Amino acid sequence: GSCFPKDVRAVDQTARAHGYEPRILPAVDAINEAQKEVLFSKIKNRLGDLSGKLIAVWGLAFKPNTDDIREASSLVLIRSLLEAGASVRTHDPEAMGAMSSLLGADAITCVDDPMEVLDGADALAIVTEWKTFRSPDFSRMKKSMKAPLIFDGRNLYDPETVANASIEYHAIGRPPVKPAV
C-alpha cells in the first residue's frame, strides 16, 4: 500500500534532517519495492515467453476490504505482464473500477465472478488475500483453466491440498509443488 513506503521515506528524511544517516531505511524501501517483482518473476520463469498467454489475477487492491490501489503490487504485476505480451483478466471485489480507470478499460478485462476469470487461463496469480479467495473449489478451478497453475502471492493455500487437486502451486518462500499423481 501507500502508507508503508511513505512512512519509511518520512522517517528517513527526518533522520537525515537531524544529521543521522539511517542506512537501513533505504534498504527497507528497496526490498519492499523489489518484493513487488517476485510474482512476475515466478510466472515468467515458469512459463517463459508470455506473448499470447492469458493470466488471471485475483486481487487488485493493496489489501482486502478497500478499493485503494496506490502502491499495490498488482500494478507492478499487471504492467509487467502486459509489457511481456500477456493478456490479463482480473477480479477484485472492490478495486476493478479504480484499476480500469488507471490502466484504461482496454488494457485489462475485469470480471465480476472470480471463477469466470479462470476460463481458459494459462495461470492464476493471487495478489490480494480477499476472504472470497480463501476457500475456492479447486476441482472447478482445474477444469476452468487451460493450465492448472497457481502463483500465490499471499500463501493462502496449503500446498498439499492444492497438489492433491492436481494443480501446480507456486507460493512465496516455499518450494513449488507439482500436482499429486
Regions found by a protein language model. Give the residues of each.
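Structural/interface elements that position substrates and couple domains in central-metabolism enzymes
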Residues: G1-V181
